[in-house]
Amino acid sequence: MAKKKAFISLLYLASIVFLPWWISLSFTFNKSLESWVNNWWNTRPSEILLNDIQEKSILKKFIELEELSLFDEMLKEYSERRLQKLHVGVYNETIQWIKMHNEGRIHTILHFSTNIISFVILSVFSILSNEELIFLNSCLQEFLYNLSDTIKAFSILLLTDLCIGFHSPHGWELMIGSIYKDFGFAHNDQIISGVVSTFPVILDTIFKYWIFRYLNRVSPSLVVIYHSMND
């Protein structure tokens, strides 16, 4: 009975790990959501919601087009046929840029919708499988309890160095950048640098409070070993 329960719990754990990937892959091959987003974006009332980076990009592009038009007016010695070709080129470039902007916005909405749907399905799945989650939690607690204090201290030290250590900002930048990309958002250095400079500090404060309140009470020897290894 225990083996069967453990096997079911392992299947549940594998489902939690691979379910978001499977949902994302399903929407990639099934074009229904993409068609709905395309239809909604192209038929909705025209409303532009832009962040500062997008506004700067759009402004820069239109300034370039305006400069090109002014340059066009300065070329009075050109023949009318050549000037007409230049106007057509500016028009085609504008249309192409608008299409690229629309595709980018559709891509953002599609990725964001896919991730929200994955989160909702995963949450419902976790609630319905509460018994397996409790069993996995008990197995994890038993596994951690059986570890020696030295192994526990080493694991805590390794985890803290990875999350809030000297080289951790590079890892946070990569992780936040990949989350941004996964949700379809444009790369934003200001937000990423803001999160990287504040979030590890918050984690460090929470971790120190956890050592002070919990580990000192449960396992003082573990705290002594941890501080010895850390020094």
From Swiss-Prot:
Record keyword Plastid present: yes
Annotated GO biological process: potassium ion transport
CC per GO annotation: chloroplast inner membrane
TM ranges: 7-27, 116-136, 156-176, 191-211
Annotated keywords: Antiport, Chloroplast, Hydrogen ion transport, Ion transport, Membrane, Plastid, Plastid inner membrane, Potassium, Potassium transport, Transmembrane, Transmembrane helix, Transport
Membrane topology (UniProt): Multi-pass membrane protein
A molecular function GO annotation: antiporter activity
Similarity comment text for this entry: Belongs to the CemA family.
Domain of life the protein comes from: Eukaryota
Keyword Ubl conjugation among UniProt keywords: no
Functional description taken from the UniProt entry: Contributes to K(+)/H(+) antiport activity by supporting proton efflux to control proton extrusion and homeostasis in chloroplasts in a light-dependent manner to modulate photosynthesis. Prevents excessive induction of non-photochemical quenching (NPQ) under continuous-light conditions. Indirectly promotes efficient inorganic carbon uptake into chloroplasts.
InterPro entries linked: CemA
Record's subcellular location: Plastid, Chloroplast inner membrane
Disulfide bonds: none
UniProt protein name: Potassium/proton antiporter CemA
Catalysis: reaction(s): K(+)(in) + H(+)(out) = K(+)(out) + H(+)(in)
Gene: cemA
Pfam families assigned to the protein according to its UniProt record, in alphabetical order: CemA (PF03040)
